[in-house]
């Protein structure tokens, strides 16, 4: 959201594991149900000079362990800029999948597994208005940044059912045939 008309959306959250399990049809096994409880969010149209201060401040204040930063356009430069300012592991990623299909396909899971904080309507009025007024007809929406960000949280943290801590998730040998 440096010079264009896009917004910067960033969210901090805690991942919780339910005591219940659900059947995963793809993996043919029961897996724990994971939830992301949103703790803080930034949604602004300010330029990089401002967001390179506000986003790292939020990440550090919330005690975030891993920061996923989309590096499609200017995101790679933004990630390099804030990497030195945060205590979390910085993980840039390229999002090549179709944004519209990702948001629509995962919308039911995002609604069920991402929990907003109590009183988020007053605390984050712009995000609340945007998310609750989002239309399935994409051209009717001026922006889709919060929806894309929430879908990304689901895809990166909840969809695979991996409950290992970040420090253990990257250990060991990965074998690919």
Briefly describe each language-model feature range:
Residues 1-93, 117-177:
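RNase H-like, metal-dependent nuclease domains and their acidic two-metal-ion catalytic environment used
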Residues 87-111:
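Conserved beta-strand -> loop -> alpha-helix junction used to position metal-binding or nucleic-acid-contacting
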Residues 112-116:
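Short glycine-centered helix-capping/turn motifs at secondary-structure transition points
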